């Protein structure tokens, strides 16, 4: 039995549009992304959220569907920290930008919290399994950190950087040093 996976991103309609390419390159550089596909994935997710908001805005303000689904959508965005709690109207969803989502990525927050020297170092730390969110070890740089989880961001207890077991190279060096010490005796 095969699964039907939905698309996670859309490629641009016009492949060689200078303004778009420059804007994407700026985002890739600023947030230390691997490729443009990461930008397109966020753009697609944002487009789906904005589409849902537009569909709800067309409905009457007293419509139960608009009230229920609108509050659920707003709650989701508030939890992610993409929108401030004070902005609790559907109109504000239409003003969201790709940067708002990029700011909530684990990679960006690791760098901004001072756990990494650069945005690229943050990605290396995450992929190297050195970062945890709460008690959960996370090795996905694009992981969107919730507001309540942000204060629990830190180095994993198993990481050599946090005083865990030394890494492969450190163990090898220690072994070499101990064998040299025995030869001298």
From Swiss-Prot:
Provide the leader sequence positions. none
Q: Name one Pfam family in it.
A: Ribosomal_S4
SMART domains in the cross-refs = Ribosomal_S4
Assembly and partners?
A: Component of the small ribosomal subunit. Part of the small subunit (SSU) processome, composed of more than 70 proteins and the RNA chaperone small nucleolar RNA (snoRNA) U3.
Q: Region Disordered: list its residue ranges.
A: 155-185
Protein name as catalogued: Small ribosomal subunit protein uS4
Entry keywords, A to Z = Cytoplasm, Nucleus, Ribonucleoprotein, Ribosomal protein, RNA-binding, rRNA-binding
Compartment annotation: Cytoplasm; Nucleus, Nucleolus
Q: State the organism of origin.
A: Dictyostelium discoideum (Social amoeba)
Free-text function comment from the UniProt entry: Component of the small ribosomal subunit. The ribosome is a large ribonucleoprotein complex responsible for the synthesis of proteins in the cell. Part of the small subunit (SSU) processome, first precursor of the small eukaryotic ribosomal subunit. During the assembly of the SSU processome in the nucleolus, many ribosome biogenesis factors, an RNA chaperone and ribosomal proteins associate with the nascent pre-rRNA and work in concert to generate RNA folding, modifications, rearrangements and cleavage as well as targeted degradation of pre-ribosomal RNA by the RNA exosome.
Which Gene Ontology biological process is one annotated for this entry? ribosomal small subunit biogenesis
**Keyword field contains Nucleus:** yes
Which InterPro entries does the record cross-reference, listed alphabetically?
Ribosomal_uS4, Ribosomal_uS4_CS, Ribosomal_uS4_euk/arc, Ribosomal_uS4_N, S4_RNA-bd, S4_RNA-bd_sf
> Is GTP-binding there in the keyword field?
no
Q: What is its main location?
A: cytoplasm
Domain (S4 RNA-binding) spans: 104-182
A GO MF label = rRNA binding
The UniProt family comment states: Belongs to the universal ribosomal protein uS4 family.
A Gene Ontology cellular component where this protein is annotated is: vesicle
- Superkingdom of source: Eukaryota
């Amino acid at each position: 039995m095969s699964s039907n996976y939905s698309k996670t991103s859309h490629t641009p309609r016009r492949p060689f549009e200078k303004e778009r390419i420059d804007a994407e390159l700026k985002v890739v550089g600023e947030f230390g992304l691997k490729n443009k596909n990461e930008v397109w994935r966020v753009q697609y997710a944002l487009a789906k959220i904005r589409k849902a908001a537009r569909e709800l805005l067309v409905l009457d303000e007293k419509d139960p569907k608009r009230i229920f689904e609108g509050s659920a959508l707003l709650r989701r965005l508030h939890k992610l920290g993409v929108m401030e709690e004070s902005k609790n109207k559907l109109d504000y969803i239409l003003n969201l930008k790709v940067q708002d989502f990029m700011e909530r990525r684990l990679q960006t927050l690791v760098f901004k919290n001072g756990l990494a020297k650069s945005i690229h170092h943050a990605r290396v730390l995450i992929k190297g399994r050195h970062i945890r969110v709460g008690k959960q070890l996370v090795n996905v740089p694009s992981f969107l950190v919730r507001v309540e989880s942000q204060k629990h961001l830190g180095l994993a207890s198993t990481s050599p950087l946090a005083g865990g077991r030394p890494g492969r190279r450190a163990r090898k060096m220690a072994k070499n040093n101990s064998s040299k010490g025995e030869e001298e005796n």
